[in-house]
Amino acid sequence: MLAFARVTLTPQLPARQRMEIITMIKGRIHSLESFGAVDGPGIRYLIFLKGCNMRCQYCHNVDTWNPDTDNLMTADELLDKAERFRSYWGKEGGITVSGGEALLQIDFLIDLFRKAHERGINTNLDTSGQPFTREEPFFSKFNELLKYTDLVMLDIKHIDDEEHKKLTGHTNKNILDCARYLSEQGIPMWIRHVLVPGITDNDEYLKKTREFIDTLDTVMNCLLYTSPSPRDS
């Protein structure tokens, strides 16, 4: 999922050269948008990454599923582009990274968000939480990422695990665990949920979704979206 410089890392390399290798991590980029008004607080510069494990039946970014792309960019290249539009952001705006599933490129995300904070740029992670696990090495990397994350927009596809599997092809257990962990760590969250006729708009499911959200301490907003019936598989 990542591109690295083709240099053999040996103890004999000067420290500066070793640092240059580390900072040459490149993200697989799907697309960029300069003016996002509904993707976090304020006006956001949007970075869509390639690759997603889930196969949501109502997905409107199907072309981001495949991780393959020739569009590779470093964190500094992206931030240089983003800062051209900084005058629009005001006090609340910044960058939002989405996908695809951004957490599949967590090493790149850490580099991007760390450098964004060094430039005083607000960071927002838009994720389904599907890659989340408390197992290593992901868990340590996730905690490192949170040091530079100002907001997480977490998309809960379905509160019922079996229905979630039908809808996305994956369990929701680690996604709900991700929400709990973010709350435990004091990370501000916006919860997103899509109302799909006949699938997620059931009163019982909505009640359970609300009950789960009520157990979280750091939810600032809940955003409901509507979608037509899912496409034929």
Map each language-model feature to its residues.
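Conserved small/polar residues in nucleotide/adenosyl-binding loops
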Residues: 225-232
